[in-house]
Amino acid sequence: MDQKDTEMNEKGVSSSTSGVVVQVREKKGPLRAAIPYMPFPVAVICLFLNTFVPGLGTFVSAFTVLCGARTDLPDRHMCCVFWLNIAAAFIQIVTAVVMVGWIMSIFWGMDMVILAKGYREQSVPQQL
């Protein structure tokens, strides 16, 4: 039995005796990683703004970075992340004419709301 398990492991097939842990990480580009983790109501407002005025919600979210919002770019300075968000807003505004920016803006707002749900789960409950 042990020899059979060893043979299977050598072929790349995992057996029931050996544990395999698979970790999946999403690779994000710099613009996508610059989306800040915001409180849920702020993220919903940014989604609403991005839906009706492309890039406006992304522009507002850039200022939350200056207020201390965390991003997936911890090694970059706050001002660099701010300018990445401003660049994303500018791209959304310029390309909204051909509908690409509008769609990108809506998806950007949806990503903000998804990240805000993670922000809410990671926040520490306040004690009175």
From Swiss-Prot:
Domain of life assignment: Eukaryota
Assigned keywords, A-Z: Membrane, Transmembrane, Transmembrane helix
InterPro entries: SPEC3/Stum (IPR026673)
A Pfam family this chain is assigned to: Spec3
Main location group: membrane
Subcellular location: Membrane
Annotated TM spans: 40-60, 88-108
Any single Gene Ontology cellular-component annotation: membrane
Membrane topology type: Multi-pass membrane protein
Family: Belongs to the SPEC3 family. Stum subfamily.
Protein name: Protein stum homolog
Lineage: Eukaryota, Metazoa, Chordata, Craniata, Vertebrata
